[in-house]
């Protein structure tokens, strides 16, 4: 799976769970904040995290859950899509994150970093884009086959405050954007800190 993102300090602690692995063969999709990815077999999809993502659907070609909706269920072709993620404009423009992975057989990944399920005859799925919290698509993984399900996307921590409140005291080299409708936006894609 991808890496969790954690925001803590001043008595506040928030964890954004990363996207899950894809399901493989008869194994269920792995759990993740963006919901489980598309299962490659009849077992259940991965579990989403309350307030962050929906569950993946059950069934061989089912999609994984996204941040805004559950995955689409199906035990036959065509493979089902992963649930879409949620759009946020905290950075000044709309960006969708935490999409669910598509079901095996080429099911499309949900909007927001979910990757497609593996096409028939292709047992591997791609890693999710970094800092999206998306979930990887499902694979078939029949008996005796070696399969590789992609990693879920790592998360991101974004802070927004009035320009007049920004102290400039940061570590970890976050991206800093000022003048975003009168606000300063800090984007952390790795370890770092901000002191007001």
What does each of the following model-derived ranges do?
Residues 1-196:
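Low-complexity, glycine/proline-biased repetitive segments and flexible coils/loops
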């Amino acid at each position: 799976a991808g890496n969790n993102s954690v925001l803590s300090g001043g008595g506040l602690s928030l964890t954004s769970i990363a996207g899950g692995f894809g399901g493989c063969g008869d194994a269920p999709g792995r759990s993740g904040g963006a919901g489980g990815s598309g299962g490659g077999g009849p077992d259940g999809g991965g579990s989403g995290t309350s307030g962050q993502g929906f569950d993946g659907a059950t069934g061989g070609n089912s999609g994984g859950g996204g941040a805004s909706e559950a995955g689409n269920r199906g035990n036959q072709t065509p493979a089902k899509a992963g649930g879409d993620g949620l759009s946020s404009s905290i950075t000044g423009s709309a960006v969708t994150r935490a999409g669910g992975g598509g079901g095996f057989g080429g099911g499309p990944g949900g909007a927001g970093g979910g990757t497609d399920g593996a096409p028939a005859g292709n047992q591997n799925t791609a890693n999710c884009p970094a800092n999206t919290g998306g979930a990887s698509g499902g694979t078939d993984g029949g008996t005796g086959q070696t399969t590789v399900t992609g990693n879920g996307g790592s998360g991101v921590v974004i802070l927004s405050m009035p320009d007049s409140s920004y102290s400039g005291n940061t570590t970890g080299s976050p991206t800093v954007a000022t003048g975003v409708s009168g606000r300063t936006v800090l984007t952390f894609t790795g370890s770092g800190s901000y002191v007001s």
